[in-house]
Swiss-Prot record:
It catalyses: 7(1)-hydroxychlorophyllide a + NAD(+) = chlorophyllide b + NADH + H(+); 7(1)-hydroxychlorophyllide a + NADP(+) = chlorophyllide b + NADPH + H(+). It comes from Oryza sativa subsp. japonica (Rice). Residues 1-33 form a transit peptide. Expressed in leaves and stems. Also detected in non-photosynthetic tissues such as roots. Disruption phenotype: Stay-green phenotype during senescence. Grana stacks fused into large stable stacks during semescence. Belongs to the short-chain dehydrogenases/reductases (SDR) family. The gene is NYC1. The active site is at Y339 (proton acceptor). NAD(+) binds at residues 175-199. The chain crosses the membrane at residues 114-134, 141-161, 479-499. This is Probable chlorophyll(ide) b reductase NYC1, chloroplastic. Residues 41-63 are annotated as: Disordered. Required for proper chloroplast degradation. Involved in chlorophyll b degradation.
Length: 504
């Protein structure tokens, strides 16, 4: 058996490897310099006279931000005495101004979301009044429904904002099965949030290759990031080690490695899993069954036990996530009976842990990514399966972008982080006709780009603001309130109709 390989790599470009890997050739990843980097000449550090002087920080911001920073500069100019204060206090004054700007824009964003939500629900309220036909009882019902939704939504929104600010800062994250597919996408998303991540896989070569790829993604992010995002990315760190989650000794080594590298573990994600295709149980070999059960169920048990042993002795505790899948709710999974039984077992395991850890500082949760276009899902899939995948499947990067922000701010225990939220399900149903052929053509051939091509333009795609992103700006409770109002309006229409509806 190959010796376990340990690879360390951070955004600062430091790379060291365990003695087992010293004999192997490797290429040091090229690092991109930040925009703010100044090229200095060899003679005493003086800048070359032939190049024009770089713009000052204030000038660069005015060019990048446009009218907003021009307005700020005008206000500072009218203040007059502020320039002297800026010179007296130097960088402290500038940092104070930047901090005030950050707080202002954060508050303005939250207020803007609240106003938009109020306006949207107000439109529904007005439609309800029009449909009621002046009935005072109906108007009272609609009014109280709207008022209750506003109060509940305001409380939930305020709590979410407080949680986000209280839990700001880098997290220490361990992800098993994170050298490809969803696990790799989760690791990338945590790194882009400024977190420190430990990746793990059976193959030392896969660990090394994945770390190099993730480092390149971070450097690409640094090259295009603005100041605030750049400061966040500078905290990112990725390290990795080989680990077979089926072996208790490997899991213990992974825990010790994470403690040595990160100091503590805030989030542990049991993502390692396998499936051997779609076929009846009688066609599965002994080795297939043993590997599926060992990886999906036994591996999660071992990792959860070791993670909880560490977290319960930490001052801030920690959170463990087990991944849901087909069969988690106890429903039948024809042609994937072994895989489904392991996921159903994890659901019972989760319920038992919740009672065991009531007074513990460790939170145990589930994460449901839905159907993700990974090798695990596509192995042995038929043409009919692929046509269905066009409607409800998503790319790993898309799912990770939704799950990670929720995982980072989770609190308590027993939370279910789901990708298929009500807005997404509604959107999938409404756009079902458009989604035909999205990932596979009529003959079942893949038409989506490979991972390397998708990640090449990841920075641009992250900057886009889609309709789904707009829907996700609001909590599920907000959408429940809006849906409840629509049900009330439908009830008014049905109850106020004088006769039977057409077609009944």
């Amino acid at each position: 058996m190959a010796a376990a390989a340990v690879v360390h790599l951070s955004v600062h470009g430091r790379l060291r490897r365990s003695p087992e890997l010293h004999a192997r050739p490797y290429h040091r990843p090229s690092l991109l310099r930040c925009r703010a980097f100044k090229q200095e000449a060899d003679n005493g550090g003086e800048e070359a006279s032939s190049s024009p002087p770089p713009p000052t920080t204030a000038e660069a911001r005015r060019r990048r931000k446009g009218p907003l920073y021009k307005l700020k500069a005008a206000i500072q100019g009218l203040a007059g005495s502020r320039s002297a204060a800026a010179e007296a206090y130097g960088g402290e004054y500038q940092r104070a101004v930047e901090k005030a700007e950050e707080i202002f824009f954060s508050v303005a964003t939250q207020v803007g979301r609240y106003v938009i939500t109020m306006m949207s629900s107000g439109v529904v309220l007005g439609v309800g009044f029009q449909l009621s036909g002046g009935d005072s009882q109906m108007n009272t019902l609609i009014w109280y429904s709207w008022l209750g939704g506003v109060i509940i939504g305001t409380m939930i929104g305020a709590n979410s904002v407080l949680e986000e600010h209280c839990k700001a800062g880098p997290r220490n994250v361990v992800i098993t099965g994170s050298t490809r597919g969803l696990g790799k996408a989760l690791a990338r998303e945590f790194l882009l949030s400024g977190d420190r991540v430990v990746i793990a896989s059976r193959s030392p070569e896969s660990v090394l290759q994945t770390i190099n790829e993730l480092e390149e993604n971070i450097q690409e992010g640094l090259s295009v990031a603005k100041k605030k995002q750049r400061e966040i990315l500078l905290h990112a760190k990725v390290v990795g080690t080989s680990c077979d989650v089926c072996k208790p000794e490997d899991v213990k080594k992974l825990v010790n490695f994470a403690k040595d590298e990160l100091g503590s573990i805030d989030i542990w994600i049991n993502n390692a899993g396998t499936n051997k295709g779609f076929r009846p149980l009688v066609n599965f070999s002994d080795e297939d069954i043993s590997q599926i059960v060992s990886t999906n169920l036994v591996g999660s048990l071992l990792c959860t036990r070791e993670a909880m042993n560490v977290m319960q002795h930490q001052q801030k505790g920690g959170h463990v996530f087990n991944m849901d899948g087909a069969g988690s709710g106890g429903s039948s999974t024809p042609l994937t009976a072994v895989y489904g039984s392991t996921k159903c077992g994890l659901r019972q395991f989760q319920a038992s842990l919740l009672k065991e850890s009531r007074r513990s500082k460790v939170g145990v949760h589930t994460a449901s990514p839905g159907m993700v276009l990974t090798d695990l899902l596509l192995s042995g899939s038929s043409l009919r399966n692929k046509q269905m995948f066009n409607l409800i499947c998503e790319l790993p990067e898309t799912v990770a972008r939704t799950l990670v922000p929720r995982m980072r701010v989770v609190k308590g225990s027993g939370k279910a982080i789901n990708y298929l939220t009500p807005p997404r399900i509604l959107l999938a149903l409404v756009t079902a006709w458009v989604r035909r052929g999205r990932w596979f053509d009529e003959e079942g051939r893949a038409v989506y780009a490979a991972e390397a091509d998708r990640i090449r333009n990841w920075a641009e795609s992250r900057a886009r603001f889609s309709f789904t992103d707009a829907m996700e700006m609001y909590t599920e409770n907000t959408w429940v309130s809006v849906f409840s109002l629509s049900v009330v309006c439908a009830f008014i229409i049905l109850s106020s109709s004088g006769g039977p509806l057409p077609g009944t």
